[in-house]
């Protein structure tokens, strides 16, 4: 029996105990599951069965499971709405603060206020503090549940603090050292606390070179910092270096997934959230790009009409228009994907503007030369007209090179201007390459027409 089949059998047994209202048996089986598996089972239930589950689990037990359910799950609002308000509020209080904030941010203001009013002033205050931070910043994804100590403590004292606060902390692998005014002054790992003598002062073993992020930093920059330094967590500070919270690696994984999805959908000029929207709302988001590109496409049609006399003299030229524009568009899209990826990674060795442009132009020349030579031979043999093959091949070489240049240049210019390079340049490349390819093709054809007509 494979793992999937075993899980299906477990879920079937769980569902049976739930429907038969066997609370003790259900709790024993359910709480023995990994919290990820608990979340999968929970999301497979209908509302009636979930109501039974709420009666069998404490808010704390449900909170542990909600902490691992994908925060972009479109059903999260519905899950919260079907609970008793007091039960939902108790669950929010038991969740890690950053996860509770993510969940509340899915609600409208009145719903958010309702749940906050049911929390204690201390719990509501912690959540409100994070709600104030701008979306997609370090402040918005950080948690305030961490362990901090002061430099004049001993290892014994620090371990006592750690043991008492470990249950509420999201991670204990890093312990942050602050002064009396809560300025971040150092960091110490759990390993250092374990291997040093109990009477050793924290000041003697702490690492004063702390890598931190600012509360207003973009979440992509925070993800880059954690990736570069292989951290499990990174501290978040304000302008005066006061320690405000930490961002953990599990939150960064979510950020990376979200940004990848955003970049992928952006290449097509659509919104990553469209999957959960109705057709009219999705259409309203796509139409601005489509209308803009429609007018740009009309420029291509107008350009072709200007060469009507050329096409009438050599009608064979019309056969290869879509071949050249399509191949150039594909090349431009490839170049765009590479450029967007390099911009997203912010790799220093690839960040040189001129080097990136030169690399893509050379790549375009090589791929264009090979593609152009191939099509020249094919057309020459097929049409028994080598000069025509030369024209098609030369146009292919130039069109691919220009498309590669545009595919790398446009996203970098968009990035310099402060626009999202994926969303702003994705749909633009194919249409632009059509325009430039037609211009290149007909100009080369007009120069050599007397040789192949």
Swiss-Prot record:
Belongs to the SLC41A transporter family. Homodimer. Residues 1-286, 330-360, 411-427 are cytoplasmic. Mg(2+) 3 binds at residues 102, 140. Mg(2+) 7 binds at residue 434. InterPro entries: CBS_dom (IPR000644), CBS_dom_sf (IPR046342), Mg_transptr_MgtE_intracell_dom (IPR006668), MgtE_N_sf (IPR038076), MgtE_transporter (IPR006669), SLC41_membr_dom (IPR006667), SLC41_membr_dom_sf (IPR036739). Mg(2+) 6 binds at residues 227, 230. This is Magnesium transporter MgtE. The chain crosses the membrane at residues 287-307, 309-329, 361-381, 390-410, 428-448. SMART domains: CBS, MgtE_N. Keywords: CBS domain, Cell membrane, Magnesium, Membrane, Metal-binding, Repeat, Transmembrane, Transmembrane helix, Transport. Its main location: membrane. Residues 142-205, 206-262 form the CBS domain. GO terms for molecular function: magnesium ion transmembrane transporter activity; metal ion binding. Mg(2+) 1 binds at residue 71.
């Amino acid at each position: 029996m494979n793992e999937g089949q075993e899980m299906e059998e477990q879920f079937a047994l769980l569902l049976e105990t739930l429907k038969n209202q066997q609370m003790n048996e259900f709790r024993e089986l359910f709480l023995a599951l990994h919290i990820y598996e608990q979340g999968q089972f929970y999301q497979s239930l209908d509302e009636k069965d979930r109501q039974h589950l709420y009666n069998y689990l404490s808010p704390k037990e449900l909170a542990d499971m909600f902490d691992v359910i994908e925060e972009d799950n479109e059903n999260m609002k519905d899950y919260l709405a079907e609970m008793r308000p007091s039960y939902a509020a108790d669950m929010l209080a038991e969740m890690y603060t950053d996860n509770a904030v993510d969940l509340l941010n899915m609600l409208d203001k009145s719903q958010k206020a309702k749940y906050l009013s049911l929390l204690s002033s201390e719990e509501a205050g912690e959540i409100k503090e994070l709600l104030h931070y701008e979306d997609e910043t370090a402040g918005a994804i950080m948690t305030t549940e961490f362990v901090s100590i002061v430099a004049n403590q001993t290892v014994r004292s620090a371990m006592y603090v750690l043991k008492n606060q470990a249950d509420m902390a999201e991670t204990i692998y890093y312990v942050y050292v602050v002064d009396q005014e809560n300025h971040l002054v150092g960091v110490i790992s759990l390993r250092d606390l374990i291997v040093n003598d109990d009477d050793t002062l924290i000041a003697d073993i702490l690492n004063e070179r702390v890598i931190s992020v600012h509360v207003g930093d973009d979440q992509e920059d925070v993800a880059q910092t954690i990736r570069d330094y292989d951290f499990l967590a990174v501290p978040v500070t304000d302008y005066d270096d006061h320690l405000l919270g930490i961002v953990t690696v599990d939150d960064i994984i979510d950020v990376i997934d979200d940004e990848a999805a955003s970049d992928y959908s952006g290449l097509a000029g659509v919104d990553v959230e469209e999957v959960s929207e109705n057709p009219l709302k999705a259409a309203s988001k796509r139409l601005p790009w489509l209308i803009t590109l429609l007018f740009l496409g009309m420029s291509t049609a107008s350009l072709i009409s200007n060469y009507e006399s050329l096409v009438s003299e050599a009608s064979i030229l019309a056969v290869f228009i879509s071949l050249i524009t399509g191949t150039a568009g594909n090349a431009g899209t490839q170049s765009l994907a590479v450029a967007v990826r390099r911009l997203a990674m912010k790799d220093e060795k690839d960040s040189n503007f001129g080097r990136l442009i030169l690399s893509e132009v050379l790549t375009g020349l090589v791929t264009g030369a090979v593609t152009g030579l191939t099509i020249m031979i094919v057309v020459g043999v097929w049409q028994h007209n080598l000069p025509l093959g030369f024209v098609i091949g030369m146009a292919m070489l130039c069109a691919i090179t220009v498309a590669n240049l545009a595919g790398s240049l446009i996203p970098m210019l968009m990035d310099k201007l402060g626009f999202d390079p994926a969303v702003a340049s994705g749909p633009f490349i194919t249409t632009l390459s059509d325009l430039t390819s037609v211009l290149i093709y007909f100009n080369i054809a007009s120069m050599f027409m007397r040789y192949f007509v």
